[in-house]
Amino acid sequence: MSTQSPQAPALSLDLKGLLCPMPVVKIAQAIKKVNIGDLVEATATDPGVLADIPAWARTSGHEVVVLERQDNLIHFVVRRLK
């Protein structure tokens, strides 16, 4: 069993109030600013990100580590893989 702490995000974004396609545009820009293997986390309010972020990650070659909705907030974490 590992005793390491979970990896902290290298970058955090507040995407609340942005509508499609801006959350994807912003995460795509942010992922280029971090090192391979690093995490970018974001909070959004547009329910479209529940489908858009996983689709973008698949086509871009990155990994969605967290995607959760609580009330009207959606929190997600993406790992840069390439």
Placement of each model-derived feature along the sequence:
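Short, ordered beta-strand-loop transition motifs
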Residues: 5, 68-71
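Right-handed parallel beta-helix/beta-solenoid
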Residues: 5-14
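Core SAM-dependent methyltransferase catalytic element
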Residues: 75-82
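Amphipathic, hydrophobic secondary-structure cores in small proteins
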Residues: 15-68
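Intrinsic-disorder/low-complexity, polar/charged segments enriched in Ser/Thr/Lys/Arg/Asp/Glu/Gln
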Residues: 10, 37-41, 73-75
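SAM-dependent methyltransferases
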Residues: 1-2
